[in-house]
Amino acid sequence: MYKMNICNKPSNKTAPEKSVWTAPAQPSGPSPELQGQRSRRNGWSWPPHPLQIVAWLLYLFFAVIGFGILVPLLPHHWVPAGYACMGAIFAGHLVVHLTAVSIDPADANVRDKSYAGPLPIFNRSQHAHVIEDLHCNLCNVDVSARSKHCSACNKCVCGFDHHCKWLNNCVGERNYRLFLHSVASALLGVLLLVLVATYVFVEFFVNPMRLRTNRHFEVLKNHTDVWFVFLPAAPVETQAPAILALAALLILLGLLSTALLGHLLCFHIYLMWHKLTTYEYIVQHRPPQEAKGVHRELESCPPKMRPIQEMEFYMRTFRHMRPEPPGQAGPAAVNAKHSRPASPDPTPGRRDCAGPPVQVEWDRKKPLPWRSPLLLLAMWGPQAPPCLCRKRGRGACIKCERLRPRIRRRGLGPPAAAPARRRIPRTPALCTPLALPAPTTRRRQSPWTRFQWRRRAWAAPLWPPRGAGADSPRWRGRRVRPPFS
């Protein structure tokens, strides 16, 4: 079953649906571990698929009718070319087809294991997917990133494309080219055979004597209704309607096979052009009804925030991550004149894009003073500018040195400092219980928010040269309005 994580990335997890079943639930006590089906090594493993038998029967029918009946009826100067061209194509198709069926496309670590014993039954109560973190829970081996577990073969296939029922084998990285050569050779051979059958069928009504150039027909000049088949090795007498019926049946089957093989070949050419596999194409074009589970998981991921909402969310998160003494209330509105109600608080327990859910302790009754100089200075910490300008028409600038004692009295100290060259983890900073410094926080912001810092900073003539801390708002005493103030 195809799944997506809540960060909109397709996961490398494929669970069997039909061939691998889960044990029925017992009313009391855990059920004993049962054994599932065995893994199939290649296309010769038992049982054969019905479409595989149909493919072999069609190959025999085309070969017998083409080489035994139709090609010997061609004019004598065309017979050698007919045998040579069609024989080479049919022989080449047989070789690549047998090779594609015989190759084991499983992952290298799976091939190193023994196929003797059956695999355990997949239990969905213990694992959500068969492959998790590049480890197959059924094959019990580490697999590559492009490997998928085939439910029909019950094994992990490297570079999985699809399970071909005509080959009764999976098509993966090891036999994909052989599969394409098999399809192309089959299409070319059927096209030539249809052309020969059409010529014989039409020429029988136009000039049947052109079909009787073989030396065996010289003794039957007065019996035009008698024909020979399987020339020249084992001539067998037959009637004209039988040859016409076989030629018409071959034309119909050949046209049907040409349409199917041509569509399949064009489809795989399209996939190669776009560098996709059949599995990836099916997943991308899966109808929306089958992706309801994915949408339900995506609902828990917060939507993309605007820059102002992003700053507010950072401030709330820093407040949550900073330990406070028990019994002490959170920061209230420091300056109601310069405060503004915040956006609605996120739902407690909402899961972010990675990591455990963040429980934000926020009082809905108290507005968030998101423009308060105290909170801005507390969030910036040592990276704050020397002066904080109020909104236009609302008083002069406020020096940060006068605000720092008020910050310490109200318990709005800056977050814990981190090393300057700290390596930022791949998970978002909001999902970790560690407080990151202000420059790290700004690097985590959106490009639009970072642009606001640079736009105001470059307006100052005393902007320091670009270096390790060039993104931080250091203005060397300049009274510049900070963003969102």
UniProtKB/Swiss-Prot annotation:
Residues 134-184 form the DHHC domain. Its EC number is 2.3.1.225. One of its GO terms (biological process) is protein targeting to membrane. The active site is at 164 (s-palmitoyl cysteine intermediate). It is a multi-pass membrane protein. The keyword Acyltransferase applies. Residues 1-41, 324-358, 462-485 are annotated as: Disordered. Keywords: Acyltransferase, Endoplasmic reticulum, Endosome, Golgi apparatus, Lipoprotein, Membrane, Palmitate, Transferase, Transmembrane, Transmembrane helix. Interacts with STING1; ZDHHC1 constitutively interacts with STING1 and in presence of DNA viruses activates it by promoting its cGAMP-induced oligomerization and the recruitment of downstream signaling components. Palmitoyltransferase that catalyzes the addition of palmitate onto various protein substrates, such as NCDN and NLRP3. Has a palmitoyltransferase activity toward NCDN and regulates NCDN association with endosome membranes through this palmitoylation. Acts as an activator of the NLRP3 inflammasome by mediating palmitoylation of 'Cys-130' and 'Cys-958' of NLRP3, thereby promoting NLRP3 phosphorylation and activation by NEK7. Also has a palmitoyltransferase activity-independent function in DNA virus-triggered and CGAS-mediated innate immune response. Functions as an activator of STING1 by promoting its cGAMP-induced oligomerization and the recruitment of downstream signaling components. This is Palmitoyltransferase ZDHHC1. The gene is ZDHHC1.
